[in-house]
């Protein structure tokens, strides 16, 4: 939210098309499962003994389906492995992949409503950072469907596999030691709170591409502090740009 406001307040910013697209980690992963390996990646990266129900939700299983699978898996010596085996059975796997494609259809519709790119365009995905998990999940989907190229631009970007191919950070591994960058990520949650808006994260989209959001966890005091900080930031930008004879 704040990076967009900051950019729009700069002189000459109106020359560049800017759009607010709502894609969360959850929706990016939900739309990215196009093969068995994609489902395996979700299971191997996120499934633990204690979070099988949330993983079932990420795999777009219904609560009833997840309860049945977890119930069967819990009787096995290693429930997490049994859960994965159940999910990867042909019938359930087909459901997951089909639902993910439907989810991707709705996410893509939302994206097109906000951005409306043409084939061959380069779209900059701008965020605070730091690992680029949303970009990693959703960029291949959008690139394949729309014929565009998605590049990430972050305030803070860590050294992740292949980072130099499609992302760059104002504070990034090309300029700073990765140990220093990882130290800064310890405080990224505070920066995220100052940069966001009092709105729940998107959890799905309607058939028309409208975002459906979860509940917001922030309270009135937190919202007031954040609003004051953002107003001060924009005021600083307005004052600072007056010192330039031409836009930086």
Show the residue positions of the predicted features:
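Long, low-complexity, Lys/Arg-enriched
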Residues: 1-248
């Amino acid at each position: 939210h704040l990076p967009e406001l900051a950019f729009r307040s700069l002189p000459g910013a109106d020359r560049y098309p800017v759009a607010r697209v709502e894609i969360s980690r959850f929706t990016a992963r939900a739309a990215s499962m196009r093969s068995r390996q994609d489902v395996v990646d979700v299971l191997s990266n996120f499934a633990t003994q204690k979070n099988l129900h949330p993983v079932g939700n990420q795999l777009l299983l219904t609560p009833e389906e997840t309860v049945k699978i977890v119930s069967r898996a819990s009787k096995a010596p290693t429930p997490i492995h049994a859960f994965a085996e159940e999910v990867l059975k042909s019938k359930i796997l087909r459901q997951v992949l089909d639902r993910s494609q439907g989810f991707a259809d709705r996410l893509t519709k939302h994206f097109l409503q906000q951005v409306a790119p043409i084939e061959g365009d380069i779209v900059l995905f701008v965020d605070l950072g730091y690992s680029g998990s949303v970009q990693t999940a959703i960029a291949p989907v959008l690139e394949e469907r729309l014929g565009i190229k998605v590049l990430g631009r972050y305030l803070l970007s860590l050294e992740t596999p292949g980072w130099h191919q499609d992302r760059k950070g104002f504070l990034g591994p090309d300029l700073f030691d990765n140990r220093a960058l990882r130290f800064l990520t310890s405080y990224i949650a505070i920066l995220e709170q100052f940069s966001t808006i009092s709105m729940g994260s998107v959890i799905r989209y309607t058939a028309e591409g409208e975002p459906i959001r979860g509940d917001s966890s922030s309270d009135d005091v937190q919202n007031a502090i954040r609003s004051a900080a953002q107003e001060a930031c924009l005021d600083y930008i307005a004052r600072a740009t007056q010192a330039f004879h031409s836009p930086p």
